Amino acid sequence: MNILYVHGFGSNYDTTSPKIKMLEELGTVVGKDVDYSSGFKKVYAEIKDFALGNDIDLIVGTSLGGHTASHVGTNLGIPFVAINPAITPSVSLKDYLGTHNDFVGSTYTLREDIVDAWPSFLTGGCGCIIVEMGDEICDANETITELTPHYEVNALPTEVTYLTT
C-alpha cells in the first residue's frame, strides 16, 4: 500500500517521526514539505499532483494536513485518515497571522487574505477521523460535533504521543 502523509501547519515531513514509523508498518510512506502560508489553492495543487504522481492508496494527514487530506482524498477518490484535523482553518489560522518561526525553525509570513481563502473541511469522501481529546490546537469536541454526521470519528484519550509528535 502506498501512503501519503501530509504534515500539519508549521511542521515538516520527517521520516523519523513516530507517526511515519507506525504507518510504515502498513506500507510505503511518502510525503513532502508543504508551505501552508502559500495558500490553499497552491497547497491543494501540490498535494494533489504529488498523490497522482505516486500512485497513492491512502492519504493520512495531521491538523491542517488532515484538512488537506479531506480535500485531496475526496476529489481524487482516495480514502483518507485525518488526525486532529483543522476543520475551519480560516478561523484557526488567525492566531498565526504575521511573520513567525515554525516548529522546525523556518520563517514564514501568513497574511489575512491567505487565511480567509482556506475553505472548511470537505465532507463526502471516504474518510476516517481520529481526534485526541487533549489536542491544544484543534478542538476535539467541535470536530466530533461537526464531522460525526459525515464520517466515523474516533476519540482517543489525552496525550497519545505517537499521534502528536
What is each residue range found by the language model?
Residues 60-69:
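Gly/Ala-rich beta-loop-alpha elbow adjacent to hydrolase catalytic centers
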Residues 5-9, 60, 130-132:
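Short hydrophobic segments within beta-strands
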Residues 16-20, 69, 140-144:
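Short, highly selective alpha-helical patches that border small-molecule cofactor pockets
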Residues 1-53:
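Active-site catalytic motif of lipid deacylating hydrolases and related acyltransferases
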Residues 79-165:
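The alpha/beta-hydrolase serine catalytic core
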Residues 71-75:
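Active-site signature of alpha/beta-hydrolase-fold catalytic machinery across serine-
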Residues 58-60, 80:
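Conserved alpha/beta-hydrolase fold motif
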